[in-house]
């Protein structure tokens, strides 16, 4: 006979000998180990997967295209999520405590928001690039140049970093909800609730690029169907051997658009539940249970590990580049000029 008269287990605190310490939620050893394994794996995939993308695009000259420079910058944002955000969030999620100091808590929040929005803005720029490439493949090289790609990269980073640090590092996110912030504040916690004005701006910054991406990829899909029917209609007049240059280019660009469109869809699936919850929370006095919030946050984080897997699955040139990098053949003098793809596969 136990139950009702058994003494309750002592309450655990993040810092046992500190007044005002946060309460610590403990897991049993096996669930704790599994959580560390699953969340840690996400961080490792984000770091090493995106590092492979960056090395491949910067090293191999065949991959020096405006689109791929955008992809490399996108991979850089995801790589930084894996380095500066995910390891610390892993400890916070499993231990339910923040052990890395108040100063890095602010930086962690700023990095988190900056790099995630940088990913979104890069994907929006890539959708514009793919739209031009598919709808006008012959003049595309003169319209979306390396300079234009560089401008898109610079603006994506500037707006995401400016937005993040102007809100969280200055404390502007706490205006009007000071009582809630005081109630949530404890030693060993790292929370950054957004007031209604800032969460609305956050939603708009997510919603507007998303609308642009969905519209452009919808247009790309329609154009691709039209081009496919046109090519099929002319197949009897000219066999595959006489396929025009324009048709080969269009086929290559459609394939690249499809792969990057899948990356965009994965991003939206990962992000949409979190954004919807953030908006609802701000207007419903932050009612989301902690474990639900953690799941939504990690869906966003895991997106940083997904893009390299998508590239590896759809791009033969990326798989070949990985083999060359891992085997150390990239250190050969002429490795940067290696032919990574056949003519029909395209450069992505």
From Swiss-Prot:
Outcome of mutating residue 117 to T/L: Abolished activation of G(s) G alpha protein in response to trace amine-binding
Family: Belongs to the G-protein coupled receptor 1 family.
Knockout-associated phenotype: Mice lacking Taar2, Taar3, Taar4, Taar5, Taar6, Taar7a, Taar7b, Taar7d, Taar7e, Taar7f, Taar8a, Taar8b, Taar8c and Taar9 show no visible phenotype or behavioral deficits. They however show an absence of aversion to low concentrations of amines such as 2-phenylethylamine, isopentylamine, N-methylpiperidine and cadaverine.
GO biological process: adenylate cyclase-activating G protein-coupled receptor signaling pathway; G protein-coupled receptor signaling pathway
Protein name in the entry: Trace amine-associated receptor 9
UniProt keyword terms in alphabetical order: Cell membrane, Disulfide bond, G-protein coupled receptor, Glycoprotein, Membrane, Receptor, Transducer, Transmembrane, Transmembrane helix
Glycan attachment sites: 19
Expression sites (tissue/organ): Specifically expressed in neurons of the olfactory epithelium.
Source organism of the structure: Mus musculus
Residues the entry annotates as binding spermidine: 112-113
Topological domain ranges for the Cytoplasmic compartment: 59-68, 129-148, 219-256, 315-348
């Amino acid at each position: 006979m136990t139950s009702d008269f058994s003494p309750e287990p002592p309450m655990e605190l993040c810092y046992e000998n500190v007044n005002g310490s946060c309460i610590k939620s403990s897991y049993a050893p096996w669930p704790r180990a599994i959580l560390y394994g699953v969340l840690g794996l996400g961080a490792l995939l984000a770091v090493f997967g995106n590092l492979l993308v960056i090395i491949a695009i910067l090293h191999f000259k065949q991959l020096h295209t405006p689109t791929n420079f955008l992809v490399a910058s996108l991979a850089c944002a995801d790589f930084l999520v894996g380095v500066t955000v995910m390891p610390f969030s892993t400890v916070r999620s499993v231990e339910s405590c923040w052990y890395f100091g108040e100063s890095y808590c602010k930086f962690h929040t700023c990095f988190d928001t900056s790099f995630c929005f940088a990913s979104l803005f890069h994907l929006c720029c890539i959708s514009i690039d793919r739209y031009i490439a598919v709808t006008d493949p012959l003049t595309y090289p003169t319209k979306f140049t390396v300079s234009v790609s560089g401008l898109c990269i610079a603006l994506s980073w500037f707006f995401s970093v400016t937005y993040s640090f102007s809100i969280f590092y200055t404390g502007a996110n706490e205006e009007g909800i000071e009582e809630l912030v005081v109630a949530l504040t404890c030693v060993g916690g790292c929370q950054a609730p957004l007031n209604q004005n800032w969460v609305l701006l956050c939603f708009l910054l997510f919603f507007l690029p998303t609308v642009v991406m969905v519209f452009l990829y919808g247009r790309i899909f329609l154009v691709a169907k039209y081009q496919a029917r046109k090519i099929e209609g002319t197949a009897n007049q000219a066999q595959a051997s006489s396929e025009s240059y324009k048709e080969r280019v269009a086929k290559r660009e459609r394939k690249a658009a499809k792969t990057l469109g899948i990356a965009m869809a994965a991003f939206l699936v990962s992000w949409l539940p979190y954004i919807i919850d953030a908006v609802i929370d701000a207007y419903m006095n932050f009612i989301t249970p902690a474990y639900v919030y953690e799941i939504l946050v990690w869906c966003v984080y895991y997106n940083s590990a997904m893009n390299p897997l998508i590239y590896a699955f759809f791009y033969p040139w990326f798989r070949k580049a990985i083999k060359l990098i891992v085997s150390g053949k990239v250190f050969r003098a002429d490795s940067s000029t290696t032919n990574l793809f056949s003519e029909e596969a395209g450069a992505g």
